[in-house]
Amino acid sequence: MTKYALVGDVGGTNARLALCDVDSGEILKAKTYSGLDYPSLEAVVRVYLEEHNATVTDGCIAIACPITGDWVAMTNHVWAFSVAEMKKNLGFDHLEIINDFTAVSMAIPMLKTDHLIQFGGGEPQPNKPIAVYGAGTGLGVAHLVHVDKRWVSLPGEGGHVDFAPNSEEEAIILEQLRAEVGHVSAERVLSGPGLVNLYRAIVKADGRLPDNLRPKDITERALDDSCTDCRRALSLFCVIMGRFGGNLALTLGTFGGVYIAGGIVPRFLDFFTSSGFRGGFEDKGRFKSYVQDIPVYLIVHDQPGLLGAGAHLRQTLGQIL
């Protein structure tokens, strides 16, 4: 008899839940709920299980916030809960709550070639360290290492490291943003809001007033070539994405590959492909040769968070991925 577990991927707006075949890892019956419609995550889980007439005793839910102990308070939502209490209330034997980028990193060993688009480099080396990052509402970062036949995710808040410019143009951007926000993290330029920051800094550095644009506006104007400032901002975004990915590769020797998780990059994929991304990735001076064979992939699987939550749980239950 097939055994299923509950898996979830929860952000500030929506909660996506599904069932995972514990043996195969297949994700089934995924459904998205608006977080605004429910008083708690537990309430959403109960609705999902009732709608699908599912009886499960194990679960893993990925959440877009730091996970540091039993008490989980979401960054972009009012939901807050005790993992132990929720596990008890649901009658689960196992309930894992993990960071959303922990889940994405755990999905990587499960991905097939048609779930990936490669941007330069050679072949990944088996069982070597992996980095994953993604620019969306914020900048998420995680690493994955292989230890004793197990994949171990190393979560963190790498998106909040200092933004380190490596060109005159980038130095001007830093100067402009520092005057506005003080500390300038990588997330201040590598995210949806970060794209707006880049555009504003470019315009203000030229002594002009920027328009009140959204990330979508900047992308559209860049792609139809109707705004030089927007095109510069998007080009710079791609280069800095490359630099940041190269930094991750250097830090942990990620010869297993560097992976970009969804976010805003797929919205301008053709532009990204022909941009200075790979040049920025390899622009490491004396250590260019160290990173030039490391492959970079864009993840195009439609639900890596659910896939990774399932992989994390299956490994916790004793399976070898």
Swiss-Prot record:
GO annotation, biological process: glycolytic process
Pfam families documented for this protein: Glucokinase
Subcellular location: Cytoplasm
Keyword Kinase assigned: yes
Superkingdom, natural source: Bacteria
Binding site for ATP: 8-13
Keywords: ATP-binding, Cytoplasm, Glycolysis, Kinase, Nucleotide-binding, Transferase
Keyword Cytoplasm annotated: yes
Cited InterPro entries: ATPase_NBD, Bacterial_glucokinase, Glucokinase
Gene Ontology CC annotations of this record: cytosol
Molecular functions (GO terms): ATP binding; D-glucose binding; glucokinase activity
SUPFAM superfamilies assigned to the protein according to its UniProt record, in alphabetical order: Actin-like ATPase domain
EC numbers, comma separated: 2.7.1.2
Substrates-to-products reaction catalysed: D-glucose + ATP = D-glucose 6-phosphate + ADP + H(+)
The family this protein is said to belong to: Belongs to the bacterial glucokinase family.
PANTHER family: GLUCOKINASE (PTHR47690:SF1)
Protein name from the UniProt record: Glucokinase
Taxonomic source organism: Cronobacter sakazakii (strain ATCC BAA-894)
Origin organism lineage: Bacteria, Pseudomonadati, Pseudomonadota, Gammaproteobacteria, Enterobacterales
Encoding gene, per UniProt annotation: glk
